[in-house]
């Protein structure tokens, strides 16, 4: 079974955000000649925000990191997953969206104490 990076996404506009996120991930997928390498779930709405998950095939991210080389390594974060979230955040900037990303594994850790 393929390994996946699960990213919690918080956004104020689900339709617009999920569409843009799909375009950005689709472009990344095309870059590495991938197919069906990501899934964006439906959202749950609470407190004025939509919460959903973007699940990305780790192999796609690894290929992208290899293709980008040092440019990928310069992204903020320790490890492949965090650097990918930084890259994704950068690619989503300037699209007039209120959006936040967090690795699902981090959100579920006891470090945060509320999940």
Each predicted region: which residue ranges?
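Short structural boundary motif marking the start of a folded domain
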Residues: 1-7
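Short intrinsically disordered terminal tails
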Residues: 1, 112-115
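Conserved short beta-strand edge segments in small beta-sheet-based binding/regulatory domains
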Residues: 71-112
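Broad gene-expression machinery/nucleic-acid interaction feature
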Residues: 4, 51, 98
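Short, intrinsically disordered low-complexity segments
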Residues: 33-74
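Short beta-strand-to-loop capping motifs
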Residues: 7-16, 53-60
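Short amphipathic alpha-helix segments
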Residues: 10-38
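Extended Gly/Ser/Thr-rich low-complexity repeat segments
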Residues: 19-28, 62-85
């Amino acid at each position: 079974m393929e390994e996946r990076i699960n990213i919690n996404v918080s956004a104020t506009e689900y339709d617009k955000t999920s569409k843009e996120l799909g375009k950005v991930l689709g472009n990344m997928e095309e870059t590495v000649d991938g197919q069906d390498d990501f899934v964006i779930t439906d959202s749950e709405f609470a407190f004025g925000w939509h919460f959903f998950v973007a699940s990305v095939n780790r192999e796609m991210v690894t290929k992208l990191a290899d293709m980008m080389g040092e440019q990928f390594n310069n992204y903020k974060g320790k490890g492949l997953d965090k650097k990918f979230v930084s890259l994704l955040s950068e690619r989503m900037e300037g699209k007039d969206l209120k959006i936040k990303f967090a690795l699902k594994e981090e959100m579920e850790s006891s470090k945060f104490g509320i999940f």
